Amino acid sequence: MINPNPKRSDEPVFWGLFGAGGMWGAIVAPVMVLLVGILLPLGLAPADAFSYERVLAFAQSFIGRAFIFLMIVLPLWCGLHRIHHAMHDLKIHVPNGKWVFYGLAAILSVITLVGVLFI
């Protein structure tokens, strides 16, 4: 018989954050590494485009703060989701693993939000 009151799963929320973090890490993060780690040090990017004043103005704008927040938080959720499922696959039992890994991701997300908003 079909259960008339099925238990709702919270897994789609975590899979959504995992997918968003993986996509961000695959598309946006390599561009930032190329730009900040290769093009700027080699002098291949216009120097005035990435002056301290312009970068600071961007980082203090709403869009800049959102970008910095997403640059930190989405890969964080992706990584902790991967670690959570890797522990399961390796048959390493972490007591309350869902609370440990997703709770850590949530706590670090709040810390990042506070840091991005107030610093």
Swiss-Prot record:
Electron transport as UniProt keyword: no
Transmembrane spans: 24-44, 55-75, 99-119
Major location, coarse class? membrane
Alphabetically list the UniProt keywords: Cell inner membrane, Cell membrane, Membrane, Transmembrane, Transmembrane helix
What does the record list as GO biological process? fumarate metabolic process
Any one GO MF annotation of this record: succinate dehydrogenase activity
Q: Where in the cell is it found?
A: Cell inner membrane
Q: Which GO terms describe its cellular component?
A: fumarate reductase complex; plasma membrane
**Which domain of life, per UniProt?**
Bacteria
Please name the InterPro entries in this protein's record. Fumarate_red_D, SQR/QFR_C/D
Report how it sits in the membrane: Multi-pass membrane protein
- The question of whether Transmembrane helix is a record keyword is answered with yes
What role does it play?
Answer: Two distinct, membrane-bound, FAD-containing enzymes are responsible for the catalysis of fumarate and succinate interconversion; fumarate reductase is used in anaerobic growth, and succinate dehydrogenase is used in aerobic growth. Anchors the catalytic components of the fumarate reductase complex to the cell inner membrane, binds quinones.
Q: Which family does it belong to?
A: Belongs to the FrdD family.
Summarize subunit and interaction data from the UniProt record for this chain: Part of an enzyme complex containing four subunits: a flavoprotein (FrdA), an iron-sulfur protein (FrdB), and two hydrophobic anchor proteins (FrdC and FrdD).
Q: Per its record, how is this protein called by name?
A: Fumarate reductase subunit D
Native organism is Klebsiella pneumoniae subsp. pneumoniae (strain ATCC 700721 / MGH 78578)
